[in-house]
Amino acid sequence: RSTPIKSSAASDVYKRQTSFLSLSLGFSTAVMIYMSFANLFASSLQTLANIHGKDDGTLHSTLSFFGGIVLILLIDKLIPHYENPHEMHRVEEMSLKEERKTEIKPQLLRVDVVTALVLAIHNFPEGMVTFLAALKDINIAIPIACAIAIHNIPEGISVSVPIYYATGNRKRAFWLSFLSGLAEPVGAVIGYLILAPFLNDHVFGVIFGMIAGIMVFISLDELLPAAEEYGKHHHTIYGLVAGMAVMALNLLMLC
C-alpha cells in the first residue's frame, strides 16, 4: 500500500528538483547573455574604438564576437555527437547505449577516458575565459564564474552517468568527472602563460569580444535547451527574467 505513496513522494521530489534546475539554468542563461552584450561586448567596442576609431573598432569587435562563436563551434564539431557534453541525451538513451558498451569489456576503458577527455577539452577554454576576464575586471569575472558553475552541473551529470553505467563504479565516475573539471584552472594558467607577453588594451578588447561570442553560443546551444529539457517552460522564463534583473541591478550598482 505504501508503494504508491512512495512513488508519489519520489515524483514530487523529482519535479521540485528539475523545476529548480530549470530555473537555475534559465537564470544562468540570462546572466551569460546579458553580461555578454551589456558588459563584455560593450567593453570590447569601447576599448577597440578608443584604439582604432569608431568604425574600425566596431568592425574588430564584431569580428571578435563571431570569431568566438566559430571557435566554440569548431570545438563542438570536433567532438563526437554522443560524447559531446553540449548535446542533450535522456537517461534512458544513455542507459541503453552504455549497456551495449558494457557487453564488450575492452571498450570500458575507452568509454571512461574519452568521456573525461571530452569534458576536459570543453572546460579548458572556460577556465581561460574566466581568468582573463578577472585580469581586466573582477566585477566582470565573478558573474561569469557563477554562470559557468551553474551550467557545469548538468554537464557533470551527463559525463558521470555514462561512466557509471559503463563501469558500475561510482567512485571512478566521480574522480574522472572531478579530474576532467580540473581542466578549467589548468586552462586559466596555460592561457595566462601563453598570452601574458601580449596582453594590452587591443588584446583585451579582442578577448572580451570573443568571450561574449563564446558565452552567447554556450547559452543558446546548451543552457537554454537544458533548461527546457529539465523543467517546465515557464520556470525557464522566470529564471531568465530573474537573471536579467539581477545583472541589470548589478551593473547599475557598479555605475
Model features per residue range: what roles?
Residues 20, 220-242:
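Interfacial loop-to-transmembrane junctions
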Residues 99-105, 112-150, 154-167, 173-177, ...:
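Generic transmembrane alpha-helix signature in multi-pass membrane proteins
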